[in-house]
C-alpha cells in the first residue's frame, strides 16, 4: 500500500512542477501567439545581420528616459511589419516605437541575447517601475504603430491641436475603427516641423497644413476626431515630462497609407528574392547516392506573390541556414553548395496557420542533399527564376572555425 501512496505523491508533485514550468517555444514547432508576452518600446539598437537589437521598453514607471535598452532576438520565423507591410529589421529606423509579442529563449544556452530570470518583468527597476526588462526577449511579432493598428482594426482620432512655430501638441485617442463601447485612453503626442504628413500621393509638412488653413499658425484648434494612422517615435521632452511620444508620420487618408504599404512591400519582396525564402524542414526521405525527398514549411509574413512563385514542377535551390537565417555558406554565392531539385508538391493548409507559418508546405526531390536539410532545421529556398546574386559577408557563415559566426553570444550588449 505504501508504494502506491508514494507513487501517487510523486505523480502529484511531478504534475505540479510541470504545471509551473514556463512556456518556451520548441525547435521545429510554431508556438501559439496566445502564449506570448506583449509589450512595446522604442528601437534603439539593431544588429540586422544577426536579427537582434535593443528596445527601450515602456514600463509601469513614469521616467521613460531612464529605461535601459533591452536586448531582443528575432525567432527564425518571426514576423516583422513596418507601414502595414512585411519588413526586415534593417528597414525600421532607430527611434521607431514597436509593438512586441515575445517568448522566453527556446534554448537559453544558445541565446544571442542575455538570459534573464523568468519573472523579470515583474521586478521593479527603480523609478522605471516594472515591465522594462521582460525575460520574454525572443520575438515572434514586431510591428510599428501603423501595422499594429491596421492588424487590430484601430485608428487614431485627433481631438485638437496646439501649435506654435510649426511644432506643438496633438491630443488623440486610439480607438476601434468601427466604434465600440470601450472607453479609449487620450494621449498627448508632440509633433514638429520634421513630422511627415501624407495625403494621397502628397508628402506635406506642418507648414503646408497651416498654409491651407487646416491647422492654425498659432494656438489651439479642434480636429473633431479626425481618423488617421500614426507613426510614433520617442524623443527627449522639456518641462519635466519624461514619458511622452512623438509623431514621426501622419497618414490623413487610406490612399496615403496604402501607398506607404505598397512601397514597403516592394522593398521586402526585392530583399527576399535576393536572400531566399526561409523555411523549416518537416521531413526528409533519404534515397540512394545522396538523393532525398524533402518536405518543408515556408515561413509566414511574406507577400503572397512570393509564395505564388513556388509552383509544382518548378526548379528550386535549397541552402542550409542558421537560426539567424544566415546562409550556411556564401563565399561563392549561396547557390554554389545548394541542393537543387524539382518541386513535387505545393500544398496549402486548410486551417489558419499559426503566426510565423505560411501554412504552405513544399516537397522537392534532390539528387544531392546537403547537411543543412535535416528535420527541424531552418534553411533557405528559392525558385530557380529568382535572381542569382551574392549575399554580403556578414549574412553567411564562414568555414565554421568561428563559433560566434554560427552562434552569436550576448557579449556585445552592455550592462547598465
Question: Model-flagged regions — what are they?
Answer:
Residues 5-14:
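Bacterial N-terminal signal peptides
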Residues 1-2:
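N-terminal secretory signal peptides that target proteins for export/translocation
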Residues 16-77, 82-416:
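Short, flexible, surface-exposed loop segments at domain boundaries
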Amino acid at each position: 500500500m505504501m508504494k502506491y501512496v508514494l507513487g501517487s505523491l510523486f505523480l502529484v508533485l511531478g504534475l505540479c512542477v510541470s504545471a509551473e514550468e514556463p512556456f518556451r517555444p520548441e525547435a521545429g514547432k510554431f508556438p501559439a501567439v496566445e502564449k506570448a508576452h506583449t509589450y512595446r518600446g522604442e528601437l534603439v539598437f539593431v544588429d540586422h545581420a544577426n536579427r537582434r537589437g535593443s528596445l527601450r521598453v515602456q514600463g509601469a514607471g513614469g521616467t521613460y528616459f531612464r529605461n535601459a535598452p533591452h536586448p531582443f532576438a528575432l525567432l527564425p520565423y518571426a514576423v516583422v511589419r513596418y507601414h502595414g507591410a512585411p519588413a526586415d529589421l534593417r528597414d525600421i529606423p532607430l527611434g521607431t516605437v514597436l509593438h512586441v509579442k515575445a517568448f522566453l529563449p527556446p534554448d537559453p544556452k544558445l541565446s544571442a541575447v542575455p538570459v534573464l530570470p523568468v519573472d523579470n518583468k515583474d521586478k521593479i527597476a527603480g523609478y522605471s517601475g516594472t515591465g522594462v526588462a521582460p525575460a520574454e526577449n525572443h520575438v515572434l511579432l514586431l510591428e510599428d504603430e501603423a501595422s499594429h493598428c491596421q492588424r487590430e482594426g484601430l485608428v487614431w482620432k485627433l481631438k485638437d491641436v496646439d501649435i506654435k512655430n510649426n511644432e506643438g501638441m496633438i491630443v488623440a485617442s486610439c480607438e476601434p475603427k468601427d466604434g465600440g463601447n470601450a472607453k479609449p485612453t487620450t494621449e498627448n503626442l508632440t509633433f514638429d516641423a520634421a513630422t511627415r504628413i501624407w495625403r494621397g500621393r502628397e508628402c506635406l509638412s506642418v507648414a503646408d497644413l497651416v498654409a491651407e488653413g487646416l491647422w492654425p499658425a498659432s494656438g489651439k484648434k479642434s480636429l473633431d476626431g479626425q481618423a488617421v494612422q500614426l507613426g510614433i517615435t520617442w524623443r527627449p521632452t522639456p518641462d519635466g515630462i519624461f514619458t511622452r511620444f512623438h509623431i514621426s508620420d501622419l497618414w490623413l487618408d487610406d490612399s496615403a497609407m496604402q501607398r506607404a504599404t505598397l512601397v514597403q512591400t516592394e522593398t521586402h519582396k526585392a530583399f527576399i528574392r535576393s536572400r531566399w525564402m526561409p523555411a523549416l524542414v518537416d521531413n526528409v526521405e533519404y534515397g540512394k547516392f545522396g538523393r532525398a525527398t524533402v518536405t518543408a514549411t515556408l515561413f509566414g509574413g511574406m507577400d503572397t506573390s512570393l509564395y505564388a512563385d513556388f509552383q509544382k514542377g518548378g526548379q528550386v535551390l535549397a541552402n542550409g541556414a542558421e537560426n539567424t537565417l544566415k546562409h550556411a555558406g556564401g563565399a561563392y554565392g549561396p547557390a554554389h553548395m545548394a541542393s537543387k531539385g524539382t518541386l513535387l508538391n505545393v500544398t496549402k493548409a486548410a486551417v489558419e496557420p499559426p503566426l510565423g507559418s505560411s501554412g504552405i508546405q513544399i516537397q522537392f526531390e534532390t539528387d544531392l542533399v546537403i547537411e543543412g536539410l535535416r528535420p527541424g532545421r531552418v534553411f533557405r529556398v528559392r525558385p530557380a527564376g529568382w535572381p542569382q546574386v551574392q549575399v554580403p559577408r556578414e549574412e553567411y557563415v564562414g568555414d565554421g572555425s568561428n563559433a560566434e559566426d554560427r552562434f552569436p553570444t550576448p557579449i556585445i550588449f552592455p550592462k547598465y
